[in-house]
Amino acid sequence: MSSLRFPYPHRYDTRVVNSAWRHLDLGGRVCVLKLRRRRLRCPGHGVLAESVPFARPGSGFTRDFEDLAVWLASKCDKKTVSTFCRVAWRTVGAMCSRVVAEKLDPDRLAGLVDIGVDEISWRKHHKYLTLVSDHDTGKIVWGAPGKKAATLDGFFTTALPEDGAKKIEAVSMDLGPAFAKSVRAHAPQAVICFDPFHVVKLATDALDDVRRQVWQSARKLSDKQIAKTYKGARWALLKNPESLTDTQKATLAQLKREGGALVRAYELKESLRAVFVGDLDTDTITNMLGKWCSWAQRCRILRFVKVGRTIKKHLDGIQAAVERGLANGRHEGLNNKVRLIIRRAYGFHNAEHALAMIMLVCGPVTLELPYHT
């Protein structure tokens, strides 16, 4: 008992609490540490059992066991972790929350200058998380459930240190109004940059909508082979030409021979992507975007007419992103990691555990295996 810490110096009574903690297995056998803890009185928290140095408060596992399980959870799927550690996946989720709360860099929000904001779906039925990343470090530094302006308001009002919002110079985001509204309210000096990735995504989504419309029209015809071709052409149209397989190249060539609105939509998408692919100066990109918007207005494809109007409306923010070299491409790379985490975990039961795992893998958290220290 002499090795125990005493954060609460006043003993409450002579009763003890019989406690047990799961430790790292010994020779393939489950190892459990048992200890009788004194009850102490804290003026702020009431009667509590004394803390121990080898386990986190409220945990039934030792620090070494939790660190091992959480490290595995950042690398493996949940079934592997559950089987190897012989614990439930929900238990691993709680471990991740405790470890992240302890090891997350406390200075991650200090001195933020250029940030990226984006939302990602963590569960079906419109369950979203808003994630904020630091463009300088490439790490996710904050997250919260939801994707509205009020969600990002919490970042500025409660998460950032005092005057932290005043130091932010630029924020990259998608073209939706919610995040821009929050930034204008809390960091009016910051330049709003509409990420080129999301600009191209507008055209990509529009192209897929046109493909669906053509497919639905073809289904009504007697020749079902035509409908099958359109249905299977999704990735041939959406992927970059240099990434196509031989089969997809053949499908795309067939569509080009047939012509029509779908091919025009594909050419519009590719021409917009080409604007941001090369290392062009701002004036050239602005000129190319203006010509593209004019083309979109004349194309007689309703979805692309709308895309052209949207780009024209947000042209200042797109120019700002190009001038500052800010794009959510790195943030989208983080989002791809997040999507992999969600797939690997087969979903999460609550947003807290989802955020903990995201911060564990993509945030400023340093993890070490217990026997490597």
Residues of each region from the PLM?
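A short local loop/turn or secondary-structure capping micro-motif enriched for an aromatic residue
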Residues: R11-Y12, A149-L152, L202
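Acidic/histidine-rich catalytic cores and adjacent linkers
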Residues: K124-H126, D134-T137, P145, T158-Q189, ...
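Basic, low-complexity intrinsically disordered segments
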Residues: S19-C31, R41-P43, S97-E169, R184, ...
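Catalytic cores of large soluble enzymes that bind and process phosphate-bearing ligands
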Residues: K34, P57, F61, A73, ...
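Short, positively charged, Gly/Tyr-enriched micro-motifs
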Residues: S3-Y8, Y12-H126, K166, K181, ...
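Core catalytic machinery and nucleic-acid-binding channels of phosphodiester-processing enzymes
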Residues: R36-R37, F84-M95, D136, L175-P177, ...
